Amino acid sequence: LVREAVVTARVTTLKGPDAGAYYVDGPGRYYLDGDEPPGRWLGRGATSLGLVGEVDDDDFLSLMDGRHPATGELLGTSHHERTVRGFDVTCSAPKSVSVLFAIGDDRVRKEVLEAHDAAVAAAFGWIEDHAHCRYRVDGEVWTVDARGLIAAAFRQHTSRAHDPQLHTHLVIPNRVMAPDGRWLALDARTLKHDQRTISALYAAGLRAELTSRLGVRWNDVVNGQAETADAPDEVLDAFSQRTRQMARRLDEKTERFVDNLGRRPTPRERWRIEREAAIDSRPSKTSEDAQALHEHWTDQLDALGYRPDGYIDRVTGRARPIEPDAATAAYFLAAAALT
């Protein structure tokens, strides 16, 4: 089994009038349900509107509809049926980090969550500082630096197959504060273009935080991602049901492509097939009791011959001294500049 390790942050465009409702009323309701924490507001744009702390459903829906959450007034121009309502920047931890959280004791789980949240905040801070908004004058599109973004951060700790998968959805409504106080549309070209940079910032931040907090050491970085050193492949594979589902669907669709066209897909065609396989194999997300999941995951680990305490000692190296490195120092300097 080859686990997907291409990017740790993905940018998805959210379109249509139901884009916001998906997260709070529809299939995505699980973002605010069950044992997951409530969403939280991020960004200077959110602060300017008085949005601090937990995400309120009505405020979120108003913003995704391009309206002021308190007054209902339009922020900029009105949306239409095909208008881009926002963007979902999803920051996902490597599988080994998710497993460490899944089977860890209270202290380890707390440190992993705080490390993840800090890395997400640093990545979002970079997005906000480099964001642009766009406007049209006499048919010509102009861009200007943005003064502040709004983001609703929804953190989750499972995949749709109930594997441990720590990740955060940064849902950014398509309304950006311009330097003159107007609310304009986000220039998505820069957001999409910088996806790999955002990925690298989150991943490097997570590694630095976990090394500092728990003494975690890392394998070599491959495609922008690294697993924790000493994490057995058999353990990571056992907690990767979603990856297996996608791999089976990808094989089926690739075989059908070859049968129909008599050739292998080009890189661009394969990228499209991979996206289709991910969507086709995606089960509905349901809530599960956190304690029940934790017990299930520790039972899985035990069946593989590993005890949680021994596994944590093996992966975190908490009995070994932490050795600061240049990457860790550079991350903390960058994070400090964002606060």
Q: Model segments located where?
A:
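Intrinsically disordered, flexible peripheral segments
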Residues: 1-338
